[in-house]
């Protein structure tokens, strides 16, 4: 996950506070100082950090709290709220709608990853059912059209550009006319970047915008610049009518928190963040779920969106029926592994689970987790239909395990490890037996049939402990809003929207 170091530091500060025998001014002060230190190291402006401390102390007045009040929970809620306020510009961004043609213009400085981000943005919307297209109006940088052409071809997205024409306005207009005729409902225009903010860049952007009349202008910014993002975002907002911001390169830089908070201070909504070079390393940015993940509380609403993307609607009733029966077979595990691999980077997916520490899977270790899943799937490929569909653990005799190991080319230990993992997941799945199913068979309507006891029962003990027990889960539901939390639990097959 992005900002793993920052999230880990804040989570540790809250955990140390929670472990204290008595919560007094000294313990609160130490907790807030640790959180402030972590934010300053992430290049968040000093004034923002100081204001956050002041606001938390106003909310958490230990002297006026009634006896028996859960001080730990109030402090955690205050930290969550203030972090959200720090990253929330308080202004919604324009949203594209399927079937209704939208023109989106990308602007930014050279080297910010603008051209790559155009393709990621198009690919994201393509997976959501849009018909995107790309227009390269960047005639300043040599190789810009080649790069866009290569990226678009790989993602199977229609594109337009010219090696001969030097007028970006003419290219933009021609591309727009062409894709409107082809009924594209999302036309993305990539414009020229420069090494610095200069009059020529802003004038060219103004001309392209005047000719194409975009519904949205997106400013792409390098997240590694930290709090310097404030001046950059402000300048582009004033000169190019920027309606939204995408921050790139948040996967490997410690200053990402500074960039996010600085952009929010300009009242410009951040709509996506880039978390790597690959086309699927691109996340929608929503403040509450982002802070929830940062604090190790997960983002199961985001996970539910990913599940909905990869699981056809006609498969959902069958999955829900198995959930109600408490039936979890190896075949079902195999199918869920297939879905998991389609969801994108595994570290990004796991960071959406409550209790997952982003430091447990640094970026370099994601491939190991992915390889393990593929290894388990190879083992299951060597099983018979009876073995895959059985719920009887005694069926897996020693002779069967030896045969499966030989057939898959794996060690016996690998097979037993996979079976242990299956048993653990099956036990968790069985706890949802008897859950009342929605009449329409949709996972999205399951949340209204859940109660707090079922949620508590289904979550693994270590995850529940990380969330602060039943009280912590209730507090999290309150923080996220009941509906949002129900959506979040949907991502685990426990509910959703």
Swiss-Prot record:
Domain notes: The NG domain, also named G domain, is a special guanosine triphosphatase (GTPase) domain, which binds GTP and forms a guanosine 5'-triphosphate (GTP)-dependent complex with a homologous NG domain in the SRP receptor subunit SRPRA. The two NG domains undergo cooperative rearrangements upon their assembly, which culminate in the reciprocal activation of the GTPase activity of one another. SRP receptor compaction upon binding with cargo-loaded SRP and GTPase rearrangement drive SRP-mediated cotranslational protein translocation into the ER.
Catalyzed reactions: GTP + H2O = GDP + phosphate + H(+)
Annotated GO CC locations: cytosol; endoplasmic reticulum; signal recognition particle, endoplasmic reticulum targeting
EC number of this enzyme: 3.6.5.4
PANTHER family for the chain: SIGNAL RECOGNITION PARTICLE 54K PROTEIN SRP54 (PTHR11564), SIGNAL RECOGNITION PARTICLE SUBUNIT SRP54 (PTHR11564:SF5)
Ranges for region M-domain: 296-497
Coiled coil: none
Similarity comment: Belongs to the GTP-binding SRP family. SRP54 subfamily.
Keywords from the named record: Cytoplasm, Endoplasmic reticulum, GTP-binding, Hydrolase, Nucleotide-binding, Ribonucleoprotein, RNA-binding, Signal recognition particle
Protein name per Swiss-Prot or TrEMBL: Signal recognition particle subunit SRP54 1
Subcellular localization: Cytoplasm; Endoplasmic reticulum
Sample GO molecular function, one term: 7S RNA binding
PROSITE patterns: SRP54
Role of this protein: Component of the signal recognition particle (SRP) complex, a ribonucleoprotein complex that mediates the cotranslational targeting of secretory and membrane proteins to the endoplasmic reticulum (ER). As part of the SRP complex, associates with the SRP receptor (SR) component SRPRA to target secretory proteins to the endoplasmic reticulum membrane. Binds to the signal sequence of presecretory proteins when they emerge from the ribosomes. Displays basal GTPase activity, and stimulates reciprocal GTPase activation of the SR subunit SRPRA.
SUPFAM superfamilies: Domain of the SRP/SRP receptor G-proteins, P-loop containing nucleoside triphosphate hydrolases, Signal peptide-binding domain
GO biological process, one term: SRP-dependent cotranslational protein targeting to membrane, translocation
Annotated residues for binding of GTP: 108-115, 190-194, 248-251
Subunit structure: Component of a signal recognition particle (SRP) complex that consists of a 7SL RNA molecule of 300 nucleotides and six protein subunits: SRP72, SRP68, SRP54, SRP19, SRP14 and SRP9.
Main location: cytoplasm
Keyword NADP: no
Organism, scientific name: Hordeum vulgare (Barley)
Residue segments, region G-domain: 1-295
Domain of life of the source: Eukaryota
